[in-house]
């Protein structure tokens, strides 16, 4: 069965007898003894975890001591993590496919992380005055700093593309052998996607492409409380409008269908 379609949970990797299967697809068969890494909502993960392991899923306990500022700081770190992960994905895509557009998105994402880092620092300093043990926030600070380093590294990866440097022949050969691509698409005024959700149009079913991020053409439509014009890991309920930019992964054939759908 299609696990992601039915549950909203994606298996992002499988560890099997000391080896790793990264980015498994609908054809991948799970075996006894496999260790699957899952990504999805807590509700979805709970059901899939119990189905795979036969054991009850126990979500981690939230910290007993919290405040509004600490909640904002933690939300910022989570968003920084999501944005930096996306930046790394796009940076490799920019180099592999010599795609200026993807490299430009990495530049935008790196700036987003820098802005989030500044907000995170302000909220963490405020939170430190409200908790009994400010030293307990050290791990959060280290995580945010590491995430910012990752986004900087993503920009370094894509800088060659931004400067117009040619890809190495080995990279070009790797691209020819790979069936999966990553690309960006602007939603046009006449696109069937404009004014509708990803689920309404069944983008993945129609094209085989998975939309991994949306950059809002109008940043005032950013998700409430997210402080960014990006929607990372959008779901079926994510509404699109003309001017939005989609980042999607899939096959070359699917990419051609995506061009038609967004035009």
What are these regions (language model features)?
Residues 85, 94, 101, 179-201, ...:
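Surface-exposed interaction/gating patches
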Residues 2, 7-9, 20-23, 28-32, ...:
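Haloarchaeal acidic low-complexity proteome signature biased toward cell-envelope/secretome components but also
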